[in-house]
Amino acid sequence: MVNPYKYFGGIITEILELAKPGVHYGKPFSSLLPLREEKTLTSREWMRTAYMYGFFVRATTAYNHKGYWKFQGSRSAGYTEDGTFLKGIALLPYLKKMGIDTVYSLPITKYSQRFKKGEMPSPYAVKSFTEIEPSYKDSLLQGFSVEDEFAAFVEAAHILGMRVLLDFVPRTAARDSDLILQHPNWFYWIRAEAAERYQAPKIENLGFCQPSIDNLRTIYSAPETKRLLGYFTESPDKLNPQVWENFYKDSVGKGNDFLESLIDLFGVLPPPGFSDWINDPQPAWSDVTFLKLFLKPPNLSREFVDPNQSPYILFDIIKASNFENDSANRPLWEYLVDVIPSYQRRFGIDGIRLDMGHALPRALESAIIQKARELDPGFVFIAEELEISKDKKALEHGYDAILGNAWWMEPRVDEGKCYEFCQKLLPGLKLPALVSAETPDTPRALARPYQKRFAKFSFILNLFLPNGITFLNSGFEIGEIQPLNLGLDNTEEGRFVLPKNNPMYGKIAFFDHFTFQWDKPDDEMFQLVLSAAPLKSECKHWCHTDNLLEGYFTPSDKIIAHLYKHPVQNQALIILANTDFHSGNWISVDVASIPELKIGGVKREYEDYRKTNRYLNMDNGYIHIFLEPGEATILTIR
């Protein structure tokens, strides 16, 4: 048995012993740097060499503390089984040992209990933009708020030398958002009786594509579009101002579920969201609705609708970044622009992944980024941009990195996509991209073809890719195979990858009670991740595109090969990865020709995913390396 107070107390004491006197670790990490590093205070360059761990508070630190029956996410015997910030603090030293320097969390905002897709709400169904999800408070702690506990988490991370990034969702909200009572005009509304029939219109004369100026007429002339527009109505405060005033007085500040009463009184409700891609087969986003960023349709779309048409949602309105619109809903914009700064001021967070930022109107996107940087010039933004060809655009818009599509390209080793992505596409990017074979939305690496072999391959490969930000999806390091969500590159069958007798069989963390297999970790995977920490920490700061050298490898269309030379010290690093999972391959490296490098020895850091200390023999200035099928390795030269 573990005494939780001794356990947590011991970890917290160890962290606090590392704190420097007089330093306020609740401020942004960039403000904590020594004065001699003043140039880095305004620099966001740290992002491109970050080693990032992504987690979902509710699931990553969830555990069956009662020790019997099944995990239910309950609060029993004084314990909170679902994840909490307190348990997150206990996880930080574990991440530090893995070499992690940046932690990224899925949304921590208060989520809605309505329109759930499973046992639990999605973290993206944001009920309050400024409140933290109350269930993330640990029942072991008395006299502290959930805000206190998150602040402590950020401080602990900063003490350990880690930055904290959050996910921000400025485009959608829960369909029973707390903002509805104060600002019903910030939402779209449909008649309640039409809710069952509401769905994205199918446009017969178009394929799977995005809305554009060229296809607007086709979109609006479609019969299903006309049907959809007929479902919309005015906001309830306009339908009956007096009844709304009374309803508002009865509901505001009481913390009760007001949506049912609103539907009964006015016969309206916010509609579910759907994709901005035309003819997208994915179902409606039943737990969220779009915020009304504009009071009118896009300028070019107005000719296609009746002047008396109620505000509505359609592809061109969702993809607001593609269409000019002179009717900004200014009070809503001002509110959204100040959400991130509120977290900066209260908690000292260090960056944001901007959900659906690519669909925001350019002026709003720019204002959000600018306001955050006014408070902290070192504050970073990651664009949820899956097309790496949009890297230049993301850079121009002020982002520091893009999500990218490594999760799609890397698993397709047999199709040559992994080689294409890592060898040809990444080095030329204008912005770094996250590199990982899995994300919270995709299948796990262990569930891909070649399973554990591929998971090991992808881990070593992604440690030192040019323009690649190494990203670990929580659970990867202990061999998790169950996906957290089915949103990308997956099917409904993807939820059934565990044995049927496993308590998590068929469960999805985004929507169900969920816990990792902490009691049965894959020690082989964990030891591999742990073994890379010293090398990653030592070399990450100089293994980037500024120090990338080309032309020293024998040609290969199967082996990914990159070489970095330290700009000052007598040191180089080589990453090699055989994308052929059926045959071994040789590659030779002309190390003697590397400029300004005195070769004392060439060390192979890994051999078939075992840490080694083997030095390679040179042959007329070359080294020759054989890579087993699906093997990745690292060479260091000193």
What does each model-found stretch correspond to?
Residues Y51-Y53, V103-S105, V164-L166, I352, ...:
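Hydrophobic faces of well-ordered beta-strands that scaffold small-molecule active sites
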Residues I11, I15, R453-R604:
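Loop/helix patches that line or flank the sugar-binding groove of alpha-linked glycan CAZymes
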